[in-house]
A protein has these predicted regions:
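CBM-like carbohydrate-recognition segments
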Residues: 2-44, 63-65, 74-92, 96-98, ...
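Short, contiguous, pocket-lining structural segments
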Residues: 145-152, 165, 169-172, 207-223, ...
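Oxyanion-binding "anion nests"
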Residues: 224-274, 278
């Protein structure tokens, strides 16, 4: 396919997904589809709605905004409560969808959105923390910091503090990133481990460092986008903190780029084990890299020379995994459905574990980031 054909196909693909989805039955939430349970407020839908709102801002096509509002309004009640959301669950994943409420509040001015934003912010007020001050990823994972959580919570936190709280929590957010850098970055590769257990109690945690054993691509992807999204929302008056996260972002992109597959432009599910049996070129993490770099370049956070790395990742992913079915429908393959640490399934962070999780098509954890990268491509 030519680049023009790929961009055209992606536009059709998003239209196909939203035409066949609703808040009750989002076809892109494969975990929900497989469970057969009613839909809940969740980060997966949040990724897709973020992508739809970005498409609206880029194209001006109101169908993306209308769909997003209808979807969110299914959950956000007139009094600002959020159906199925419980702040006391203390799950950072549930904060992610809150970013979209700022957009709808700005566009429509409805008080229920501001109340819902405040409700989600109340979770962070009492979210358990490590002794050094980082949010626990979830209440059910005590003393643990996961890279994923930076994307799920920090952009929302930074936007709230900047807009509504006189920047009181902005330094706190910055310090959480610095703690992650100190504990979770591998000095040899520059990559970051998926998880960190301050207590060193979990079976997956290194007894010395507290880190999990491997570099999972999507976790790195979430982390890269988190830095870009936080900087987008951060006031540059916080000069040292702003420059600190920006320098960390640039260094991370430089280090990650070294693991980009020369032939396809993609990245491997476990990043530093290319070609190992069971490993594969993975869509969601590659798309997150492309999006983080393209957006970082557009915002002036990253040097322009890096855009070529992102384009290679973007088109490489589409060439390998975006296809048209005989019935004319489109699908995006190569998406790791889920990966975590601990829990009832004894997820130990080993290579065998990361290779064992299902690989699916059309899940928003891959589709959302690819569409976000697509919006950056067409906005140039």
């Amino acid at each position: 396919m030519t680049h023009e054909e790929i961009l055209s196909m992606l536009g059709d693909y998003v239209d196909y997904l939203i035409a066949n989805s609703s808040a009750e039955a989002p076809m892109w939430n494969i975990e929900k589809v497989r469970s057969g349970k009613p839909n809940k407020w969740n980060y997966i839908d949040g990724c897709m709605i973020t992508a739809c709102l970005s498409l609206y801002h880029t194209t001006g096509d109101k169908k993306y905004l209308d769909f997003s509002k209808q979807f969110i309004d299914y959950f956000v009640q007139p009094d600002g409560s959020i159906q199925t959301y419980d702040p006391k669950e203390y799950n950072l994943d549930n904060v992610n969808q809150g970013k979209n409420l700022f957009v709808l509040y700005d566009l429509y001015g409805e008080k229920k959105y501001r109340k819902a934003i405040d409700l989600i912010r109340s979770q962070l007020e009492t979210q358990p923390r490590t002794k050094e001050g980082n949010f626990w990823h979830k209440d059910i994972y005590p003393w643990q910091v996961w890279l994923d959580g930076t994307y799920m919570a920090q952009p929302f936190y930074m936007e709230y503090e900047t807009r509504f709280n006189k920047m009181q929590g902005c330094i706190d957010s910055y310090k959480q990133f610095m703690n992650i850098r100190r504990h979770m970055r591998d000095p040899k590769t520059g990559l970051y481990y998926h998880g960190y257990d301050e207590s060193r109690a979990m079976y997956w945690a290194d007894p010395e460092t507290g880190c999990s054993p491997n570099f999972w691509l999507r976790a790195m992807g979430w982390f890269m986008v988190a830095m870009v999204d936080v900087l987008e929302r951060m006031d540059e008056q916080l000069y040292n903190e702003y420059r600190g996260i920006q320098a960390m972002l640039k260094q991370t992109i430089e280090d990650v780029h070294k693991f980009q597959d020369e032939e396809t432009g993609m990245f491997w599910q476990v990043m530093d084990h290319p070609g190992v049996e069971g490993n594969y070129l993975e869509t969601s993490g590659t798309a997150l890299f492309a999006y983080a770099v393209l957006k970082g370049v557009r915002l002036g956070l990253l040097p322009k020379r890096m855009a070529a790395w992102a384009e290679k990742a973007f088109y490489g992913t589409c060439d390998k995994y975006l296809s048209k079915n005989p019935d004319g429908s489109l699908q995006l393959d190569g998406i790791c459905l889920v990966a975590g640490l601990g829990g009832k399934d004894h997820r130990d962070g080993s290579l065998a574990y990361y290779f064992s999780e299902p690989v699916v098509c059309n899940d928003a954890k891959g589709v959302g980031p690819l569409v976000l990268a697509y919006t950056e491509m067409i906005a140039r």
